[in-house]
Amino acid sequence: MPNFCAAPNCTRKSTQSDLAFFRFPRDPARCQKWVENCRRADLEDKTPDQLNKHYRLCAKHFETSMICRTSPYRTVLRDNAIPTIFDLTSHLNNPHSRHRKRIKELSEDEIRTLKQKKIEETSEQEQETNTNAQNPSAEAVNQQDANVLPLTLEEKENKEYLKSLFEILVLMGKQNIPLDGHEADEVPEGLFAPDNFQALLECRINSGEEVLRKRFEATAVNTLFCSKTQQRHMLEICESCIREETLREVRDSHFFSIITDDVVDIAGEEHLPVLVRFVDDAHNLREEFVGFLPYEADAEILAVKFHTTITEKWGLNMEYCRGQAYIVSSGFSSKMKVVASRLLEKYPQAVYTLCSSCALNAWLAKSVPVIGVSVALGTIEEVCSFFHRSPQLLLELDSVISVLFQNSEERAKELKEICHSQWTGRHDAFEILVDLLQALVLCLDGIINSDTNVRWNNYIAGRAFVLCSAVTDFDFIVTIVVLKNVLSFTRAFGKNLQGQTSDVFFAASSLTAVLHSLNEVMENIEVYHEFWFEEATNLATKLDIQMKLPGKFRRAQQGNLESQLTSESYYKDTLSVPTVEHIIQELKDIFSEQHLKALKCLSLVPSVMGQLKFNTSEEHHADMYRSDLPNPDTLSAELHCWRIKWKHRGKDIELPSTIYEALHLPDIKFFPNVYALLKVLCILPVMKVENERYENGRKRLKAYLRNTLTDQRSSNLALLNINFDIKHDLDLMVDTYIKLYTNKSELPTINSETIENT
């Protein structure tokens, strides 16, 4: 069997990394010699293919002159190597051994008979080979291009070999199989354990793949067939080729937008997931994942690398970028804002917008530069994740809600449904949290102090204790109450931004009123904060939570007898004022004049046009996109025809209500300027993807991160997994690899590494 040496009385295993193991040769004559010298009768009736696939001999059975170490990492046999060193008698001294291979001593007549049989079989095979060689196919000759030099046999074999390696890597990516099979601390010292890549490679060898078998039949089996460096280079090429398929469509579409998701941990390093939005040839708005960018702590360096990667490495022309959006958690918001501003300086039409997949209130809360807010948001996410760990925890919370809201069954039912969803990303998340807080505290207390009837394991009880301590801290109470009240002014506005196209259009007109309300709050912050603090105090009293200043501040004030600072004034200066100021400024930044002009152009959508009684002025707002139009001089006349078309439509014709519907109109090609404008508006990150089939990039990204352990994540394999349905050209991957590494030592013509323990 492959894990054991096939020689009689030899108990060595191929998992020992300090000793090379070799396959039986597939050459009939050499294989026959190996079998004869082994003196194992049970191997005589097996074919060379079977022996090559299932049996091994360790290096102890070969003269040292037969073993060639071409480098410290490569051990191979010479072409004429024959095993000659065997122990055929030690089993006689231990007749009771249960784990020795049984040996049948062959007589000279038996050996001569077997030799004659093997010679006859070899002769028949040679005759068949000669017959086939005398009748070559004419088609192969005709297919040769006179202007291209034909590949040598070695070059063809090397390309087929590389193609097999790339096939395995693509398979591993699509099926989300990590490269490493075992953790380093799982493998005992001195043992060889193949990684997942090598295991799949050996599987294909044993399944009869000729190219791989020929390449590795003389190579020690307990070696790395493909080094980590080679694997990394091939993975980079796989990633690049798969990404290029998407980027080619983006370039054909011309216009696109860039979106980044929250920073993620890839094998211990922080990365930014990057997605692109574009309209494909079938007029469908698509949002596709194109890769990870290493995150930089310095915002200016991050901005430079972000731009360089997109333009130089990925080959996108940022002159065609019409939108940019960044979904990040609290600690990264300010840095991504620097990235956005640097891109805007170079490309003014790359409008900085909100992303449709993130609620405005959630986005604003994450951007608030107050430590207490960041801590509170993290606690909220942990509480939600805790109760979603198991159905039993959600049922426990449901029962507490039923008791607390027994006089309002409808509200109880509504809250239960909300708790079973990912409610932390909702527009009204803080209102929900304030309503649920008592139920959450009582439920967590119940888990901590559960009686013998309901038992939770130590981990659940421990997490419940930590979370209960966090949500019953007065600092947390004040923070969520202030956020609830401040963000109540933007809730309806944000909800409309994620609504229908007409809702988005009219939301743009309501921004002035929202800012006016927030400015009024800022002017009267003393009064507003007094009400907010009173609400927080009442909630704390209801939950029997002591009202106190944060411990860090109290320790700093020790010995300061002149300090007259109260809890109310402390939270006004450190929480309410900076939060309101930041939200006002953030709304002004995210809804710039260009952004609002773009949203005003949504009156091109026929249903919006109808609500405005066809009295619209798109031409004025569309000036910013004039250079994007195929025939800008005819825009005015074309817009007039577009309005007349829908104003005088038939009674049975409904007005298209979305950009998606308008782009798929059969006669849209007769309105080239309108079509161009709709395409540009469609790719703005603030516009939602109407057809969910084309929003797979983000969903698959979330699924990959959810289903893959942090230390097993790979930025290369992630792209293959997320874009598993994108076609791939193995020949292109092979040609690219040969072009890049043909003169380098890591080209897999020297491909085996023996694992040494130094």
UniProtKB/Swiss-Prot annotation:
Which Pfam families does the entry link to? Answer: Dimer_Tnp_hAT, DUF4371, THAP
Q: Name one GO molecular function term.
A: DNA binding
Give residue numbers for the modification (Phosphoserine).
Answer: 563
Q: Name one GO cellular component term.
A: nucleus
- Per the record, the zinc finger regions (THAP-type) lie at 1-86
Q: Which PANTHER family match?
A: 52 KDA REPRESSOR OF THE INHIBITOR OF THE PROTEIN KINASE, 52 KDA REPRESSOR OF THE INHIBITOR OF THE PROTEIN KINASE-LIKE PROTEIN-RELATED
Q: How does it assemble?
A: Interacts with DNAJC3, probably sequestring it.
Protein name per its UniProtKB record? 52 kDa repressor of the inhibitor of the protein kinase
What gene name is given for the protein in this entry? Thap12
